[in-house]
Regions:
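Stable alpha-helical structural segments in soluble proteins, enriched in small hydrophobic residues
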Residues: 12, 125-133, 164, 196, ...
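Acyl-CoA/ACP chain-elongation machinery
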Residues: 24-70, 103-117, 145-154, 171-221
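Flexible, glycine/charged-enriched surface loops at secondary-structure junctions
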Residues: 95-99, 135-141, 171-173, 206-209
Length: 256
């Protein structure tokens, strides 16, 4: 059981993969589930000024990367996937959908509710995932961003993406599916890894909805506004960052 805030779902997947690689397990059910919409949680996140107050238009309140974003919208749900070694999958007659090629995690302990503005901690996590997968940042075709729709958090992730991709940032479709689902906290990594897997499997990039005016500080990025898009995806990155400074990156690839 992983208890690492909003990165917990991705870390559960990463830990499951490590157990399989070490021989401790052949197959694992991994991801996250969360039922968090309750008075205590709402009061706590409200006190932290983390929640959107756009109550007049709740359907559009979750708006990552938008200049008018003002906090996240809490969501509930679950996302689980079965991971296993290729040998085990073949032995039971299963057809692999995608390959888990890279995973990395880090902690920066910068602040209880936000990462460092230079994205350093998250960058370390993604670089660890790239190293595990023997990939370079230039090989990533899509990013499912953590982007929760908070003013500070989205900017920190943008810094991470600039660190990783440099001048190539505009060539990589970056989606925040939290614009549609809200923020599922500990389940976020589970459900977003499934979005990422489907992007790899189907060569379709999910959109970032509610993005009407892109933040000027994020000029040059392609956030796939409004509508899904056909796009070849060989390797995709899924990010998950949690309160307290925990970071995780997961890379899913077409089956080789």
């Amino acid at each position: 059981c992983i208890r690492d805030s909003c990165a917990a779902g991705l870390q559960a997947i990463g830990d499951g993969a490590r157990m399989i690689a070490s021989g401790e397990a052949n197959i694992a059910l991994v991801g996250g589930a969360e039922a968090c919409v309750d008075p205590l949680s709402l009061a706590g996140f409200h006190a932290l000024k983390a929640l959107s107050t756009n109550n007049a238009n709740p359907e559009a309140a979750s708006r990552p990367f938008d200049q008018d974003r003002d906090g996240f919208v809490m969501g509930e749900g679950a996302g689980l996937m079965v991971i296993e070694s290729l040998k085990h999958a073949i032995a039971r007659g299963a057809t692999p959908l995608v390959e888990l090629t890279g995973y990395g995690t880090s902690t920066d302990a910068h602040h209880i509710t936000s990462g460092p503005p230079d994205g350093a901690g998250a960058t370390r996590a993604v670089n660890a995932a790239l190293k595990m997968g023997k990939l370079t940042a230039d090989q990533i075709d899509h990013v499912n961003a953590h982007a929760t729709s908070t003013p500070v958090g989205d900017l920190a992730e943008i810094a991470t993406l600039r660190n990783l991709f440099g001048s190539r940032v505009g060539d990589i479709p970056v989606s925040s599916t939290k614009s549609a689902t809200g923020h599922l906290l500990g389940a976020a990594g589970g459900i977003e890894s499934i979005f990422t897997a489907m992007a790899v499997l189907k060569d379709i990039i999910p959109p970032t909805i509610n993005l009407t005016q892109q933040d000027a500080a994020m000029d040059g990025f392609d956030f796939v506004p409004g509508r899904a898009r056909d796009h070849q995806v060989r390797h995709a990155l899924c990010n998950g960052f949690g309160f307290g400074g925990v970071n995780a990156g997961l890379i899913l690839s077409k089956v080789s």
